[in-house]
């Protein structure tokens, strides 16, 4: 498996208010793999809307630390894997509104993202095929994830 490049990109979700409906402005970091937005890859493959954001959203520093720990799989032994929510509802952050997740594995060759899925917390995750797996250099991956909260 070839190494992929993980980067983060600042994104602004504009706010608005019309007809009694308010959309909250959000600034967040989007995951990019080899230059492509992971959200765009997921929504174009899955055929759903793209109104999601990562938990690296401005104004929620406590959430950032939890997300960093989840992405680094700190509690897993090498060879272990964990499913991590990577995109959430931009209004409330509740998985019940729908979310995208990925299985993250710490292997002897690096960090692997695979088995992407859409989930809502009350049904089994719905696998999204034809995406990944992606292999990342473990040191570079760790650096990017640890530095992310400072970029929010």
Give the residues covered by each predicted segment:
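Intrinsically disordered, low-complexity acidic regions enriched in Pro/Ser/Thr
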Residues: 1-152
């Amino acid at each position: 498996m070839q190494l992929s490049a993980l980067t983060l990109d600042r994104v602004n979700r504009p706010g608005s208010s019309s007809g009694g409906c308010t959309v909250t402005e959000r600034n967040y970091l989007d995951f990019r793999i080899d230059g492509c937005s992971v959200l765009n890859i997921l929504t174009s493959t899955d055929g759903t809307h793209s109104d999601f954001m990562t938990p690296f959203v401005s104004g929620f520093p406590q959430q950032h630390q939890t997300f960093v720990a989840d992405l680094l799989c700190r509690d897993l032994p090498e060879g272990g894997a964990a499913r991590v929510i990577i995109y959430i509802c931009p209004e409330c952050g509740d998985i019940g509104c729908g979310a995208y997740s990925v299985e993250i594995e710490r292997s002897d060759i690096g960090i692997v993202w695979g088995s992407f899925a859409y989930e809502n917390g009350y049904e089994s995750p719905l696998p999204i095929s034809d995406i990944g797996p992606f292999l990342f250099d473990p040191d570079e991956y760790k650096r990017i994830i640890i530095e992310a909260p400072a970029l929010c």
